[in-house]
Regions:
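The feature captures the conserved acid-bearing segment of alpha/beta-hydrolase catalytic domains
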Residues: 1-54
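C-terminal catalytic histidine-bearing segment of alpha/beta-hydrolase fold enzymes
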Residues: 43-133
């Protein structure tokens, strides 16, 4: 998930992120991450499946559980093992992260996987596009 991610560094490796729009892990932090990485020169693609949840299913619903999805609106960027900041620039301590800053009591259910084949095709197409000779 993209609620916490490393600050961009120099890389030549293209990246693909696939998310279900209806997931208990919303796409927003991944879009924030992708934009930040693009500004640093990364080739990064984000594919959103509009009707899908976390499992690429259409039958999902939000349920009680525990998930690391509480920083979706302002994800935490890891600059090194001692420096963490939200995308908006607010410093966060490792202790805050360990104590559950980004956890919520929200989970997801539904595993009918209507978009799983499309997700697999998206991944295979991505690999074909970026295959090195």
């Amino acid at each position: 998930d993209c609620n916490t991610f490393w600050a961009p560094s120099l890389s030549q490796t293209p990246m693909l992120i696939m998310k279900g729009q209806e997931s208990h892990y919303p796409p927003k932090p991944c879009e924030i991450m992708a934009n930040l990485y693009r500004k640093s020169g990364y080739e990064i693609s984000v594919k959103i499946f509009p009707k899908s949840n976390h499992y690429f299913s259409h039958s999902g619903r939000i349920v009680k559980g525990k998930a690391y999805n509480g920083c979706s609106d302002d994800p935490v960027i890891i600059y090194n093992l001692r420096e963490f900041k939200t995308a908006s620039g607010v410093s966060v301590s490792l202790d805050e992260l360990r104590k559950g800053k980004c956890f919520t009591p929200t989970g997801g259910s539904g595993k009918t996987r209507e978009d799983l084949d499309a997700a697999i095709e998206t991944a295979l197409d991505f690999f074909d596009k970026h295959r090195t000779p």
